[in-house]
């Protein structure tokens, strides 16, 4: 079978090239991407169906975030969500994403007490949830926990800058690392890298500071409200796809209106059922 070029002339059909099999993304793949200057995207996921779609789209890292507290369970902050509420979500995401690296958030209260508590929490996510790595919030103050987890063979993604679990002590949703506070943010980044974290999320950090930190670290940086020069970017998928209600954060770009489409579909479905239009003959046995 022939194909046509842009001018309409037939071209000989080319033999199909075998597709390169995709393999599971591992932490060393992210390190290689940083070394080669390749930027990559990370999204949150909380269930099998969306994880499957994102995996098919080639998203290399999926985060089962404690943001599930807000978008799955309806809490006002991430503070109330528990390990028992998150582990079933991790299981679904791992099943739906055969290629992505699946990272599980350690929720508030599960690791602050020290290395032993962090190891107990992380072990549950790895054994019961099937996660490939865990994420925890904090810089220098959690370096000991990070070192303990990595020594136990558990890959750790760190999270500095604005840390949502600390929203009460930070005085609300505020940019971190401005002015004199920049030195502490840099110190936090260096501390988590030296403790063995394989990557670090920087949230709501001035773009210039994030660029500086990205250049200092050998591990990948992942930005959310931290400018364009991080090695990766992450968004909550409901924000990215237009499922969230209310005003979006400044760092969010909506790439679709899934919420509007779903609302229209549900409205049309209800209308057709009420009108006796659905199910039609073609939907019957």
Curated annotation (Swiss-Prot):
Molecular function terms, GO-annotated: 3-methyl-2-oxobutanoate hydroxymethyltransferase activity; magnesium ion binding
SUPFAM superfamilies: Phosphoenolpyruvate/pyruvate domain (SSF51621)
Residues reported in the UniProt entry to bind Mg(2+): 66, 105, 137
Domain of life: Bacteria
EC number in record: 2.1.2.11
Disulfide topology: none
Localization annotation: Cytoplasm
Stretches for region Disordered: 1-23
Pfam families: Pantoate_transf
Pathway(s) annotated for this protein in UniProt: Cofactor biosynthesis; (R)-pantothenate biosynthesis; (R)-pantoate from 3-methyl-2-oxobutanoate: step 1/2
CDD domains: KPHMT-like
Active-site residue list: 203
Bound cofactor: record note: Binds 1 Mg(2+) ion per subunit.
Needed cofactors: Mg(2+)
One cellular component term from this protein's GO annotations in UniProt: cytoplasm
Protein's GO biological process: pantothenate biosynthetic process
Keywords, sorted A to Z: Cytoplasm, Magnesium, Metal-binding, Pantothenate biosynthesis, Transferase
Annotated 3-methyl-2-oxobutanoate binding sites: 66-67, 105, 135
Catalyzed reaction equations: 3-methyl-2-oxobutanoate + (6R)-5,10-methylene-5,6,7,8-tetrahydrofolate + H2O = 2-dehydropantoate + (6S)-5,6,7,8-tetrahydrofolate
Compositionally biased residues, Low complexity: 9-21
Binding partners and assembly: Homodecamer; pentamer of dimers.
HAMAP family named in the record: PanB
Function per UniProt: Catalyzes the reversible reaction in which hydroxymethyl group from 5,10-methylenetetrahydrofolate is transferred onto alpha-ketoisovalerate to form ketopantoate.
PANTHER family attached to this UniProt entry: 3-METHYL-2-OXOBUTANOATE HYDROXYMETHYLTRANSFERASE
Entry similarity comment: Belongs to the PanB family.
Name by which UniProt lists this protein: 3-methyl-2-oxobutanoate hydroxymethyltransferase
Lineage: Bacteria, Bacillati, Actinomycetota, Actinomycetes, Mycobacteriales
């Amino acid at each position: 079978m022939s194909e046509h070029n842009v001018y309409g002339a037939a071209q000989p059909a080319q033999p199909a090239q075998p597709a390169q099999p995709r393999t599971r993304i591992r932490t060393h793949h992210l390190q290689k991407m940083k070394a080669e200057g390749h930027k990559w995207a990370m999204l949150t996921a909380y269930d099998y169906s969306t994880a499957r779609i994102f995996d098919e789209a080639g998203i290399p890292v999926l985060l089962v975030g404690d943001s599930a507290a807000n978008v799955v369970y309806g809490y006002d902050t991430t503070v109330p969500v528990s390990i028992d509420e998150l582990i079933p979500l991790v299981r679904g995401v791992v099943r739906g994403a055969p290629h992505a690296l699946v990272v599980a958030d350690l929720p508030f209260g599960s690791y602050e007490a020290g290395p032993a508590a962090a190891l107990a929490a992380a072990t549950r996510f790895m054994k019961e949830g099937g996660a490939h790595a865990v994420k925890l919030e904090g810089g220098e103050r959690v370096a000991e926990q990070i070192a303990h987890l990595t020594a136990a063979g558990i890959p750790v993604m760190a999270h500095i800058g604005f840390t949502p679990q600390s929203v009460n002590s930070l005085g609300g949703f505020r940019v971190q690392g401005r002015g004199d506070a920049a030195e502490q943010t840099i110190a936090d980044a260096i501390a988590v890298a030296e403790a063995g974290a394989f990557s670090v999320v920087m949230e709501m950090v001035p773009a210039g500071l994030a660029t500086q930190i990205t250049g200092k670290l050998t591990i990948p940086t992942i930005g959310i409200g931290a400018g364009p020069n991080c090695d990766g970017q992450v968004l909550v998928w409901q924000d990215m796809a237009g499922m969230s209600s209310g005003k979006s954060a400044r760092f969010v770009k909506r790439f679709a209106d899934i919420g509007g489409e779903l609302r229209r579909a549900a409205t049309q479905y209800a209308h057709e059922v009420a009108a006796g239009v659905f199910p039609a003959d073609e939907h019957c046995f």
